[in-house]
C-alpha cells in the first residue's frame, strides 16, 4: 500500500491517538502483575498497601474468580496508596514459597514489606474493597502511633 506522505502522516497520527486512548483507559485501573524480580521491591514501597492475589492458571477456583480481580482494580483506581497486584505461582514459585502460599486462590495484604492480613471473606468486589480499605486505614493509624 503506497500512501502519499501527507496521508501516511495522518494515518500514523490517527493510529497513535487510538493507542494513546486505549492506554489512557487502562491506566490506574490495571492489576499489576508481580514477579520474582518485582515482588519484594513493590511490596516494600513506602506508605503503600498492596492487596495481592496468588493463583495458578490451572486452578478451577482461580478460574471461577473470572474478572473479579480486574474489577477490583478498576474500583480501586482512585484509592490513594492502595495497589492491587497478582502473582502467578506457576511462574513465580519462589515468591509464593517465600510468603507461604499453599492453596489457591490466596489473598494477602502487605504494607511496607510486611504481610498484615489475609483475606478469607466473600468473593465480591464490595467486600474486597471494604477489606483492603480497612486494612489501609489500620496501617496508616499504626504508622501514626509509631511516629
UniProtKB/Swiss-Prot annotation:
This is Protein disulfide isomerase-like 5-1. GO terms for cellular component: endoplasmic reticulum. Disulfide bonds join 59-62. The active site is at 59 (nucleophile), 62 (nucleophile). Keywords: Disulfide bond, Redox-active center, Signal. The gene is PDIL5-1. Pfam families: Thioredoxin. InterPro entries: PDI, Thioredoxin-like_sf, Thioredoxin_domain. Residues 1-29 form the signal peptide. Acts as a protein-folding catalyst that interacts with nascent polypeptides to catalyze the formation, isomerization, and reduction or oxidation of disulfide bonds. May play a role in storage protein biogenesis. The lineage of its organism: Eukaryota, Viridiplantae, Streptophyta, Embryophyta, Tracheophyta.
Amino acid at each position: 500500500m503506497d500512501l502519499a506522505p501527507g496521508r501516511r502522516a495522518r494515518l500514523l497520527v490517527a493510529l497513535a491517538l487510538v493507542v494513546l486512548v486505549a492506554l489512557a483507559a487502562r491506566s490506574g485501573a490495571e492489576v499489576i502483575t508481580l514477579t520474582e524480580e518485582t515482588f519484594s521491591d513493590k511490596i516494600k514501597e513506602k506508605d503503600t498497601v498492596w492487596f495481592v492475589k496468588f493463583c495458578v492458571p490451572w486452578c478451577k477456583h482461580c478460574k471461577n474468580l473470572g474478572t473479579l480481580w480486574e474489577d477490583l482494580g478498576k474500583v480501586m483506581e482512585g484509592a490513594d496508596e492502595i495497589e492491587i497486584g497478582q502473582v502467578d505461582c506457576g511462574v513465580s514459585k519462589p515468591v509464593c514459597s517465600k510468603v507461604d502460599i499453599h492453596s489457591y486462590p490466596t489473598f494477602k495484604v502487605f504494607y511496607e514489606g510486611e504481610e498484615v492480613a489475609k483475606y478469607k471473606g466473600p468473593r465480591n468486589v464490595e467486600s474486597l474493597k471494604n477489606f483492603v480499605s480497612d486494612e489501609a486505614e489500620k496501617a496508616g493509624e499504626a504508622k501514626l502511633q509509631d511516629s
